[in-house]
Amino acid sequence: MSSFWSRNISLSIFGESHGPAIGIVIDNLPPGEYIDVEKLRQFMARRAPKKDGTTTPRGEKDLPQIMSGLLNDRTTGVPLCAFIQNTDTRSKDYSNLARLPRPGHADYTGAMRYRGFNDVRGGGHFSGRLTAPLCFAGAVCGQILERRGIYTGAHIASVHGISDDAFSRTKVTKEDILEVRGKDFPVRNDAQGEKMKEDIRNASQGGESLGGIIECVTINMPAGVGSPIFEGLENTIAQ
């Protein structure tokens, strides 16, 4: 399985859901870029589970520990490595997965790919827990891009047929992006957000989960980024 991605920068993700830690190595970051560590932790806290019944009950704090690549809050130019400890694991809850794979998960395909040697606890390397290091990378790159005037943001567009107010197709401001970013439940219309949360809690009480749609926007991107055929926006997403 490839957990490595490389273009202008490279990302290598490591760890498993119930191992000691998970983490990421980011290479080719420009040297001398200021990284506000407190803002980085605030960004990571947005991903961490909430105690409102709408997220996983797993209580991870998602506190990244930077091992290399940052000195005096500035990138040094060498690979930036960070790891995040796993502190709330209940591996016994997954003891039967080697014999009874869950539908909709990677338990079966992972066993086929790795001949049964893969770590099934919590989903192992296939777990949503591995999005935490990706959020770390996004937080780092986001600070670098915002210094150049490029802002990216997202909100929950819909959950179970309940829709939030969409971003404008012609004019989105930095303030629009930052307003949603500061919310515990990232919607533009708080009344619709309350309806979403109620549906999520009801589904959770019944042992179910709900699907949703995210709308993401980037502003102030320079024109002409990418290439035809394989490196346009839709082409890149399709890959």
PLM feature segments, named:
Residues 44-103, 107-109:
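Glycine-rich, N-terminal phosphate-binding loop and its surrounding beta-alpha-beta segment
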Residues 1, 102-117:
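Acidic-glycine-rich active-site phosphate/pyrophosphate-binding loop
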Residues 113-230:
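Glycine-rich, mobile lid/loop segments that gate access to catalytic sites or pores
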Residues 32-37, 91-93, 226:
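Short, conserved charged micro-motifs
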Residues 1-58:
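N-terminal, positively charged regions that mediate nucleic acid binding
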Residues 10-15, 22-28, 80-82, 110, ...:
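Short beta-strand elements
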Residues 9-29, 129-141, 230-232, 238-239:
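Conserved phosphate/anionic-ligand binding catalytic regions in large, soluble enzymes, centered on
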Residues 7-12, 64-69, 195-205, 224, ...:
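Glycine-rich, charged/polar anion/phosphate-binding loops
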